[in-house]
């Protein structure tokens, strides 16, 4: 998962002849171990491995359940409202892909980073993880942009072509996410020996340049640019909703800020650590104690970044009353009849009180629609306009 090679002592490894042809092995070992020769700090590696395993396991179990539920519920949705959830559905698929790769990292940690699954899986697993990582980030970015466009754009052209545009954007995101990791993956190799390791190993003569290029591209494309777009469009959306003075505008504005903060918390520590370790020794010189500390906590920080697979389903799905109602309706279908009647009554009661946002003409306030109006209220029920609404795109 990392472009930073492990600095652990690897002197027991004996590379084969093919590997010696592209690397100066003595200098490469010195590169891996140079941070340990100047000042060595004793860390409890066993404790770190236990913490990593428990952390990976918790993210795997919770993330698997959450994203499977999100996919099941959103796959059953159709029509205009369902199209607004297209980014959420694809983001859940990408997050699920990351979750499914976690058992491999868990075993690698317990085996002290010994790779036992061959050369092909060494590259494929990393590629699979990176494709889904970029896809998840890009779909989150597209969702933030689409939410604002949906709120502000009432042109007939957008109304006619929005579904086609969203499908094209989703396809483009998957293609782009499949291309971006290639420069990194082609240099991921299995280091054969008594304890095989799967590492990023560009030719030694150009190693620093390759590592810096990969790290910078990951930082710019995987964090800086998406974070800028997510922050700008969520702030614009929050300001727009606040001006409409609707009942739940405060809640929606808080959600906009939560989207920004959670993204930064998940990815900023990882990106900063990776960039510092990549730049160290060639462009900047950090204190050796700090370098040892960063290397020790790098895997923990990397694991921490995967919390977005747990946070995304909560922020973009489970906080939505409509999603919870549809989830309960889906569960009711598989319950025995007696329990289904009781649960169905609760679902009906819940759905009758939830509200959805209907975007009206420019300058007017959003109307509230009650799902099950009484007969006396039917004549006052607002007409559904052709402009898109933000139900569950915001909630």
Swiss-Prot record:
The chain crosses the membrane at residues 54-75, 87-109, 124-145, 167-189, 214-235, 255-276, 296-316. It comes from Mus musculus (Mouse). Keywords: Cell membrane, Disulfide bond, G-protein coupled receptor, Glycoprotein, Membrane, Phosphoprotein, Receptor, Transducer, Transmembrane, Transmembrane helix. Residues 1-53, 110-123, 190-213, 277-295 are extracellular. The modification Phosphoserine is found at residue 329. It is a multi-pass membrane protein. Pfam families: 7tm_1. Residues 76-86, 146-166, 236-254, 317-395 are cytoplasmic. GO terms for molecular function: G protein-coupled receptor activity. InterPro entries: G10D_rcpt (IPR001350), GPCR_Rhodpsn (IPR000276), GPCR_Rhodpsn_7TM (IPR017452), GPER1-like (IPR047143). Orphan receptor. Its main location: membrane. This is G-protein coupled receptor 182. The lineage of its organism: Eukaryota, Metazoa, Chordata, Craniata, Vertebrata. It is found in: Cell membrane. One of its GO terms (cellular component) is plasma membrane. Belongs to the G-protein coupled receptor 1 family. Disulfide bonds join 122-198. Glycans are attached at residues 24, 33. Expressed in liver and lung.
